[in-house]
Amino acid sequence: MRSDTVKTGFEKAPHRSLLKATGAIASNNDFRKPFIGICNSFNELIPGHAHLQELGRIAKEEVRKAGGVPFEFNTIGVCDGIAMGHIGMRYSLASRELIADSVETVAEAHRLDGLVCIPNCDKITPGMMMAALRINIPVIFVSGGPMKAGCTPSGKTVDLISVFEAVGQCSTGEITESELETIQDSACPGCGSCSGMFTANSMNCLSEALGIALPGNGTILAIDPRRNELVREASRKIVDLVNNDIRPRDIITRKSLLNAFALDFAMGGSTNTILHTLAIANEAELDFDFSELNALSAKTPYICKVSPATMDVHIEDVDRAGGISAILKELSRVDGLLDLSAPTVTGKTLGENIAGAEVLDRNVIRSIENPYSATGGLAVLYGNLAPQGAVIKTGAVSPEMMTHTGPAKVYDSQDEAIKGIMDGDICAGDVVVIRYEGPKGGPGMPEMLSPTSAIMGRGLGGSVALITDGRFSGGSRGACIGHVSPEAAEKGPIAALENGDMITIDIPNRCISVDLPETVIAGRIAALKPFEPKIKKGYLARYAQLVTSANTGAIMKNPAYCESK
């Protein structure tokens, strides 16, 4: 066992003395058992994590029963909703790397034999997964579970996105501040990750397809007693995984990544999942090119539409309809789409895991013969405005915006754009451009939920597009094109745009372009002043120096690597 490094032999007496002082060692016999880290992310700032202390307690109890010795430790976490719309959002994506590094540090420093990872919200799940693949010791994931959707006193189903959009409605006088407060007080009724197919729930659902979590991980509500049982089962299973030396890189392979992307496209997951899955592939040392995604999307039917794509279906409805296993079972009917031989932490293949699944509500999970669209709910666009690609959640775009040409309204920050939208500077037909908000430029590639919600709330969602080198919340809807690469701070073409330039978005043909000759674009870029970092001290300053482009997952490379590029 790895942990023998810190517990076996007479020379390790000081180590054993310290371990006994933790209170986790019941007797000397425990030094003959595997040491299992309970990698929790409990904190009282994130509603999706406020209940995880109890799940950690359950996990420790079950690991001990199964023959392991549990040691709980915590990672940091950021609530994207609370961090939205101010400098805090610049820390959100950057926190993913801190989480990965911190999990690596604890597991390696203390020579843990395995990990039960208990994440839930946006950057915590991928951060822990990146660490799991980096250190490659047996790991199982069990998330905290989704929040139940809210309900107003009048019976209207609402969620966090309802509140963001209500802010826009309030700004136009469509609703009163009192009505806004009612929505505010109804939308988030308790603990759990926000209730739609936003980033947190998307990643926790993908964990099932990747094979690193048990069936049910993505959809069983946080408040459902079955969530505690799932934690118990996962915590027993980790001891088996350690005893059989089954590691993350045995499970997360190229074929399981393709399975996860297929699920993502079938349920119209958050655009952030592409960013995170590319980063996960990097940690697994798997070559996966951004450009491959359109070919996979082309053969993946979009069969499960969940908020924000439709406001009357939430994760609890997906669970009731059969969960992720039912979606995967339906997708398995598409010839050659899924690799059902992919191994999973259950000890069975993906195909064996979903064999007994069935769709219980065709209004929630459609058949492959009757999809919302024949192609997936996410796409990568290319063109002279995004030569390295840009990402859009096609499943949340209204039909009239699938193709659109309009004049650019250019803003060099999210704050400027929000002010412009709220001041009424945006008209039907416009293409809002928010730049210098990419991984380096932001820094931290902040989410644009506030401006997209303001556009929706002001009734412009069917006539205005938004393009950015930043990213979007999983809750954004409309013609929202993000991850434009190269970013403005790297002198990508988006930096050359000026007000009035005509931009064409052609989603069916996966194209985004500006009506300018290449010579004009090149000339404007050549005239740009060198980018001046917005933040020059602390973690974000270091992050901005080391982070790579969105089309590679916005991962961090060491300075020598960056200089060689």
Swiss-Prot record:
- Protein role: Functions in the biosynthesis of branched-chain amino acids. Catalyzes the dehydration of (2R,3R)-2,3-dihydroxy-3-methylpentanoate (2,3-dihydroxy-3-methylvalerate) into 2-oxo-3-methylpentanoate (2-oxo-3-methylvalerate) and of (2R)-2,3-dihydroxy-3-methylbutanoate (2,3-dihydroxyisovalerate) into 2-oxo-3-methylbutanoate (2-oxoisovalerate), the penultimate precursor to L-isoleucine and L-valine, respectively.
- UniProt binding sites for [2Fe-2S] cluster: 121, 194
Q: Cross-referenced InterPro entries, in alphabetical order?
A: Dihydro-acid_dehy_C (IPR042096), DihydroxyA_deHydtase (IPR004404), DiOHA_6PGluconate_deHydtase_CS (IPR020558), ILV_EDD_C (IPR056740), ILV_EDD_N (IPR000581), IlvD/EDD_N (IPR037237)
Enzyme class, first EC level, given as a word: lyase
Annotated active site residues, numbered on this chain, are: 473 (proton acceptor)
PTM N6-carboxylysine: list the residues.
123
Q: Write out the similarity annotation.
A: Belongs to the IlvD/Edd family.
**Which pathway does UniProt place it in?**
Amino-acid biosynthesis; L-isoleucine biosynthesis; L-isoleucine from 2-oxobutanoate: step 3/4; Amino-acid biosynthesis; L-valine biosynthesis; L-valine from pyruvate: step 3/4
Q: Which GO terms describe its cellular component?
A: cytosol
Q: Quote the protein name from its UniProt record.
A: Dihydroxy-acid dehydratase
Q: What range does the record give for the signal peptide?
A: none
Task: Spell out the subunit comment.
Answer: Homodimer.
Give the EC number(s) under which this enzyme is classified. 4.2.1.9
- Quote the record's binding site residues for Mg(2+): 80, 122-123, 447
Q: Name one GO molecular function term.
A: dihydroxy-acid dehydratase activity
Question: Which note does the record give on the cofactor?
Answer: Binds 1 [2Fe-2S] cluster per subunit. This cluster acts as a Lewis acid cofactor.
Keyword annotations for this protein, in alphabetical order, are: 2Fe-2S, Amino-acid biosynthesis, Branched-chain amino acid biosynthesis, Iron, Iron-sulfur, Lyase, Magnesium, Metal-binding
Superkingdom: Bacteria
Q: Which PROSITE patterns match?
A: ILVD_EDD_1, ILVD_EDD_2
| Reactions performed catalytically | (2R)-2,3-dihydroxy-3-methylbutanoate = 3-methyl-2-oxobutanoate + H2O; (2R,3R)-2,3-dihydroxy-3-methylpentanoate = (S)-3-methyl-2-oxopentanoate + H2O
- Give the SUPFAM superfamilies listed for this entry: IlvD/EDD N-terminal domain-like (SSF143975), LeuD/IlvD-like (SSF52016)
